[in-house]
Amino acid sequence: MSGYQHILIAVDLTPGSEAVAHRAQELAGRYGAKLSLLHVVEFIPVDPAGEALLPPPVDIEGELVQGARRRLDALCDNLGLQSAARRVEVGNIKAEILRVVAEEKADLLVLGSHGRHGLALLMGSTEKSLVHKTPCDVLVVRLS
């Protein structure tokens, strides 16, 4: 193996995202790999009974995506990753990460893991699912 060529960083834009991206930066520097960042907005539509509370022309999904783009840009600026490719996708987090890994032909996925306790351990997690289903190497950065 000659090293990684394309590292995809999946971030949730919480404070731990900086640590995840920093770890990926270290690896990219070591291997001379391309870096890309991905955030998935998992939009859950408001149920019809709740729609009456919102003014009709509100584009919640669009606002969530624009806010995520701003935060992803700020993260890249803070880490000196202005030239890194970045994507904000809408959909199921696991499905979108798997789709983007395949589209981008990433050979390493880097993501963070918040510690799970009690019932959450039995329910499974996005991270656990991705480790088993992603067609490339996965580095899970422990954040807790």
Language-model segment annotations:
Residues 55-68:
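A short acidic, glycine-rich active-site loop
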Residues 1-2, 30, 76-109:
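Structural beta-alpha unit
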Residues 126, 134-135:
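Short, structured coil segments at secondary-structure junctions
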Residues 108-129:
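Glycine-rich, Arg-bearing micro-motifs that act as flexible, cationic patches
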Residues 52-56, 103-104, 127-129:
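Short, hinge-like loop/turn segments at secondary-structure boundaries
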Residues 138-144:
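Short, flexible loop segments at boundaries between secondary-structure elements
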Residues 2-54:
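Small/aliphatic-rich secondary-structure junction motif
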Residues 38, 85-89, 139:
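General small-molecule cofactor/ligand-binding pocket signal
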